[in-house]
Amino acid sequence: MPAAADVHPYNHALIVAAVLSAIGALLHVACIAGGPAWYRFFGAGERMATAAERGEWWPAIATLGITLVLLAWAAYALSAAGMLPVLPLLKAGIVAITAVYLLRGLILFPVLALKPSQVTPFIVWSSLICLGYGLVHLWGVVQVWDTL
């Protein structure tokens, strides 16, 4: 009888990381569907919300671009977790994705120290979310490093 660890060979931290990126992607789609009010609520900025109100196409295109990036990042996390076939440049890709999330999250602290007047609630919560995403990725990457 196989040991409990042998039953599920997938890396759970990277599966969670993939789900987090997919949730981010879905929230970006919700912003497109929800329109200007959703752009404002999620902190996309008044310029983006106003452009969406005017019916301009670029807010949806930019948001769709972010959605596609987040879905690709979810796929890379699933690949590194062992749930999808090995994607091109998997090790470099998952390390870069992890670094982007961590750096995006950590940027909060120098901004708090150097320009606290520019820190908005959006910057705080989005930075903390990205830092959390990055830490989950890092946890998983460390666990699978030798197999990448």
How should each PLM-predicted stretch be described?
Residues L14-A33:
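N-terminal signal-anchor transmembrane alpha helix
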Residues A60-A77, I129-L131:
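Core segments of transmembrane alpha-helices
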Residues G132-L148:
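Membrane-water interface at the C-terminal end of transmembrane alpha helices
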